[in-house]
Amino acid sequence: MTRVEETAINLTVQWLQNNGYESADDYLQTGGNLVQLAEDLYHKETQGDLQSVWGDRKRRDGFAGSLYLAAEAI
């Protein structure tokens, strides 16, 4: 996992906590998309593009899994 991905995960977990979500599932039940949220938060914070670190779908899916696990551990 790259530093960019770690930063995006940390920003997302922090946002979920600050907005009253107790887990990733709480957010997903609202119809939210964790990866899209991570992309948006990362861009807002750094003006960077999270998608630029993903060379293929497998890499993006790995990020999505790591993000979900981190958000479940809130």
Description of each model-found segment:
Residues 3-49, 59, 63-71:
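Amphipathic alpha-helical segments in structured regions that serve as interaction surfaces
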